[in-house]
């Protein structure tokens, strides 16, 4: 629309690259995609010749390589013999993840560079390389508006970890390309990058940072953020043969329609406080407070039709695979649609494996997989018992049909469900020590607490009904300064009544939903800012502000009903 109306390139009227990754633009700049050369050049014959000459590389690639989904298909077909994976977890994050795992399992050589030792992908690695994490890296980052910024390390390198550029250089030198990879520091690479951007450019290519081709090390260290490319298109000129823009018609691929066997449409995405496959954010108990378990969100009308209630276990199935989730009934979806989060993996859960579910269909131009419209069906599961375990130390074995673990303050919370005698589960999961327990065979309940010098070190609560105490108070007892009594521990609550804060909404300030709703109601608050002034909620990172706004709206509706 901005192009057709002649406003393209003016402030507020520019294309926005919805890439999802903070340095995706930087990846394009340096040719980090299989479909591009370095310095924002494509595989046109003249560009291949230019880069070949600049790098003195006679064996230059002359056409685009394999995109991610295609790559793993070729590995599975035996067409790719070696794979080096850096800073990603494709065994979880790609669609039809079961096929990806099959490909990794049969690939003759897999190397993985990561700052996390144990990931679903690293389990297929023949060689593991300890890489620098984000806070240990030194270099530049480019955001979506082409702003290049210096990123300086916050922490020294841990152990044998090394930056990716150093690891690549060492491998290349060992293979014989000593001169081509003789980098001593990130500034060396940046200078080469700048030289290539201006090499035989003459104004033909928008990306040109040649003014930094000879930047000194001190100047690089002190580099201030700058945006390259000026304001393209604002002058009405475009990088085409006649200088005019092109409107390219795009044929919309057909959306997946619900079928008789697959009557629902599965949408997938991320939770508010987690990122990718939780290899980093999953280490934080605070970030796990918002959602401690993988949930399938379902519209109330669909839930009623399928006789699914909140907290039920539900198997989500698609033509690609199936996985088990906890049900969350929500009117935030349209009828016929369900949503599951992408984060959970084999490392955290026996269920919640969203990567197994989407179809591996991709956009024909970008190769981007579609994760938003997979035909699916839901099946309610009825285990004999459901419950949870809390423990200071992660149990060595979790022999439950359904189990998902999450870090909490001073320990772990493991949600469990299954069939058979739960006493066998207690024996396998709980540590040795002074034990107190209550068994109610009529209700199918088992409550066990393990103490050490009177202090709680582990507990298990399971029930046929699935109704168990709130987790938060029991979790707090793992590090309580004053030990709770045996009666309180087995009851799962303190003897003296405590205010129920409800689910945590603001992680930064530990503010619960019920606290926010009560404050909105009693003080007549009508804005997120007012809630922030009263409770501090929403005044730090800001990710909970939409949730607070919804609570304000819901409270106002209830008041005027």
Specify the residue positions occupied by each region the protein language model found.
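Short beta-alpha connecting loops at secondary-structure transitions
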Residues: 130-132, 136, 146-158, 283
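Long, low-complexity segments enriched in small/aliphatic residues
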Residues: 27-33, 188-284
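Rossmann-like nucleotide/phosphate-binding core characteristic of flavoprotein oxidoreductases
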Residues: 367, 372-375, 379-561
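Catalytic alpha/large subunits of respiratory electron-transfer oxidoreductases
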Residues: 1-137, 171, 175, 227, ...
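Flexible, glycine/charged-enriched surface loops at secondary-structure junctions
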Residues: 9-18, 179-186, 529
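Long, contiguous, secondary-structure-rich segments that constitute the structural scaffold
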Residues: 157-160, 164-215, 277, 281-297, ...
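Flexible loop/turn segments at secondary-structure boundaries
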Residues: 22-26, 90-95, 118-121, 136-139, ...
């Amino acid at each position: 629309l901005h192009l057709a109306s002649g406003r393209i390139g003016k402030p507020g009227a520019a294309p926005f690259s919805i890439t999802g990754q903070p340095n995706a633009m930087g990846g394009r700049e340096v040719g980090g995609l299989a479909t591009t050369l370095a310095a924002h050049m494509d595989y046109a014959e003249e560009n291949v010749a230019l880069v070949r000459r600049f790098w003195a590389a006679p064996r230059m690639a002359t056409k685009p390589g394999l995109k991610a989904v295609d790559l793993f298909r070729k590995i599975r077909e035996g067409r790719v013999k070696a794979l080096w994976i850096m800073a990603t977890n494709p065994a979880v994050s790609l669609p039809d993840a079961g096929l990806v795992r099959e490909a990794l399992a049969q690939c003759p050589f897999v190397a993985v560079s990561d700052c996390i030792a144990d990931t679903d992908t690293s389990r297929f690695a023949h060689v593991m390389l300890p890489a620098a994490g984000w806070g240990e890296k030194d270099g530049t980052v480019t955001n979506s508006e082409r702003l290049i910024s210096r990123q300086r390390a916050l922490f020294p390198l841990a152990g044998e970890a090394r930056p990716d550029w150093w690891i690549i250089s060492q491998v290349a030198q060992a293979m014989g390309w000593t001169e081509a990879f003789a980098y001593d520091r990130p500034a060396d690479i940046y200078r080469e990058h700048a030289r290539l951007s201006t090499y035989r450019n003459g104004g033909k290519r928008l990306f040109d940072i040649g003014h930094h081709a000879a930047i000194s090390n001190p100047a690089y260290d002190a580099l201030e953020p700058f945006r390259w490319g000026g304001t393209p298109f604002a002058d009405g000129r475009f990088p085409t043969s006649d200088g005019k823009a092109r409107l390219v018609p795009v044929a919309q691929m057909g959306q997946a329609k619900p079928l008789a066997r697959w009557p629902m449409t599965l949408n997938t995405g991320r939770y508010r406080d987690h990122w990718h496959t939780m290899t980093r954010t999953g280490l934080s108990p605070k970030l796990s407070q918002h959602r401690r378990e993988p949930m399938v969100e379902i519209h109330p009308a669909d839930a009623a039709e399928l006789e699914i209630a909140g907290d039920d276990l539900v198997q989500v199935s698609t033509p690609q695979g199936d996985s088990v989730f906890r049900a969350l009934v929500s009117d935030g979806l349209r009828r016929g649609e369900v949503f599951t989060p992408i984060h959970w993996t084999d490392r955290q859960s026996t269920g919640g494996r969203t990567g197994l579910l989407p179809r591996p269909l991709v956009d024909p131009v970008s190769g981007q997989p579609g994760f938003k419209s997979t035909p699916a069906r839901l099946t309610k599961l009825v285990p004999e018992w459901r419950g949870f375990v809390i423990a200071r130390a992660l149990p060595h074995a979790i022999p439950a049909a359904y189990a998902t673990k999450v870090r909490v303050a001073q320990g772990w919370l493991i949600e469990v469900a299954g069939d058979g005698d739960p006493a066998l589960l207690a024996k396998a999961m709980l540590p040795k020590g002074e034990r107190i327990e209550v068994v109610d065979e009529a209700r199918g309940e088992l409550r066990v607490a393990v103490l050490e010098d009177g202090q709680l070190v582990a507990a298990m609560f399971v029930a046929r009904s699935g109704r168990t105490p709130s987790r938060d108070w029991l979790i707090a007892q793992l590090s309580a300064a004053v030990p709770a009594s045996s009666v309180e521990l087995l009851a799962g609550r303190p003897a003296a009544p405590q205010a129920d804060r409800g689910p945590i909404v603001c992680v930064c300030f530990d503010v619960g939903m019920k606290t926010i709703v009560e404050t909105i109601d009693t003080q007549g608050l009508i804005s997120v800012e007012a809630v922030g002034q009263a409770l501090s909620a929403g005044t730090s990172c800001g990710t909970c502000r939409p949730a607070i706004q919804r609570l304000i709206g819901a409270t106002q509706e209830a008041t005027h009903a």
